[in-house]
């Protein structure tokens, strides 16, 4: 693993702050679950950005940009001969994506993101020409057009040198698309409202059913599985909205999260949940450091000796081993004790990661170990 070398005391402090046990507090249903069917839908499209200051596609390497421009001009009544390939630098082929929010109606604006798909240096100062945005079913749900807002900067010289700040090949158009088609009504025709938890938990589902029945009467809600709660509701849309406005504000105490240890293998970050416990175990942990250095030696013969200068390589390999450290954990050892034991000997974050992995393999870590 390529782990960070930040001081472990800082890491331990951050972990301890994240794991401070807080008393269970009541949460609203709207913060724990979402209404089934009420979600956004992804839209995607293809288009052209024009008006760039020489930072567009190099059409010799992106012929589809020229083809797209010819097709667009043809639709506008301008015919470009088939054997003519204009070398443009102020046009860029782009991919467009947006999210169609739930209950969006025709005429409402939505934001769009525009990304270069060829070799444009920057989209700064460009304008997106009218482009349709389609859903997964192939239907057009919105039309996008407008001036781009680009947070980055990029420039390229004639010799191929390039400088860029942030990502100039991606921009956004606030309110850059207009909804043209509404999604089907998810509230029509059913006598139940489904609530889907953000995290599956049988305890939370059981408590949610009890809280809803306590507020609206016995038998109002039923548990479907570890994620879903079904609630009886009227079929009239207005009455369903009124029920939901009361339902989403019902409060309950969610179940405790499962014991889990999360390790980021790239940064060395370790997050340990407050319910993590360790079975009785003893650990010896040491480290071996191998250093290889290369030195170049030059052998220079004397003047008029007729010899040749020779270059030789000399390798030096050294290995150092630190003394093993012994850790002994009694049954029920908590997060604070684990961190304190490893921290007292001045260990690095990588040492804690290795110890946790070894404990998991030995069956002494009563938690899920997740490496991301």
Swiss-Prot record:
Function statement: Assembles around the rod to form the L-ring and probably protects the motor/basal body from shearing forces during rotation.
Keyword Nucleus: no
Major location category of this protein: periplasm
Gene field: flgI
Any single GO CC term annotated in Swiss-Prot or TrEMBL for this entry: bacterial-type flagellum basal body, distal rod, P ring
Species per Swiss-Prot/TrEMBL record: Xanthomonas axonopodis pv. citri (strain 306)
Entry protein name: Flagellar P-ring protein
GO biological process: bacterial-type flagellum-dependent cell motility
Keyword Transmembrane helix attached: no
Alphabetically ordered keywords of this record: Bacterial flagellum, Periplasm, Signal
UniProt-annotated location(s): Periplasm; Bacterial flagellum basal body
């Amino acid at each position: 693993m390529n782990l960070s070398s930040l001081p472990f005391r800082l890491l331990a402090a951050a972990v301890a702050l994240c794991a401070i046990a807080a008393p269970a507090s009541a949460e609203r249903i709207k913060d724990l679950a979402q209404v089934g069917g009420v979600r956004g839908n992804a839209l995607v499209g293809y288009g052209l950005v024009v008006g760039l200051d020489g930072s567009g596609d190099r059409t010799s390497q992106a012929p589809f940009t020229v083809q797209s421009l010819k097709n667009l001009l043809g639709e506008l009544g301008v015919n470009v001969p088939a054997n003519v390939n204009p070398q443009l630098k102020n046009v860029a082929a782009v991919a467009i994506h947006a999210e169609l929010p739930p209950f969006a109606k025709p005429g409402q604006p939505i934001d769009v993101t525009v990304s270069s798909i060829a070799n444009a240096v920057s989209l700064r100062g460009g304008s997106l020409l009218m482009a349709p945005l389609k859903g997964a079913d192939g239907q057009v749900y919105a039309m996008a057009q407008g001036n781009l807002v680009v947070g980055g900067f990029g420039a390229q010289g004639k010799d191929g040198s390039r400088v860029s700040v942030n990502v100039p090949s991606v921009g956004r158009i606030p309110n850059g698309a207009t909804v043209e088609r509404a999604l089907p009504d998810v509230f029509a025709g059913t006598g139940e409202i489904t609530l889907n938890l953000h995290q599956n938990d049988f305890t939370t589902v059981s408590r949610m059913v009890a809280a809803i029945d306590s507020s609206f009467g016995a038998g109002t809600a039923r548990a479907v599985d570890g994620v879903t709660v079904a609630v009886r509701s009227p079929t009239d849309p207005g009455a369903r909205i009124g029920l939901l406005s009361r339902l989403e504000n019902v409060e309950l105490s969610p179940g405790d999260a499962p014991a889990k240890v999360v390790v980021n293998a790239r940064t060395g970050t370790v997050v340990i949940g407050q319910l993590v416990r360790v079975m009785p175990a003893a650990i010896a942990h040491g480290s071996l450091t191998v250093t290889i250095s290369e030195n170049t030696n030059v052998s220079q013969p004397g003047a008029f000796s007729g010899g040749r200068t020779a270059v030789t390589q000399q390798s030096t390999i050294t290995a150092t081993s630190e003394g093993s450290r012994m850790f002994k954990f009694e049954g029920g050892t908590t997060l604070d004790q684990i961190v304190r034991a490893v921290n007292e000997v001045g260990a690095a974050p990588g040492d804690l990661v290795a110890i946790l992995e070894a404990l998991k393999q030995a069956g002494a870590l009563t938690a899920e170990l997740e490496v991301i």
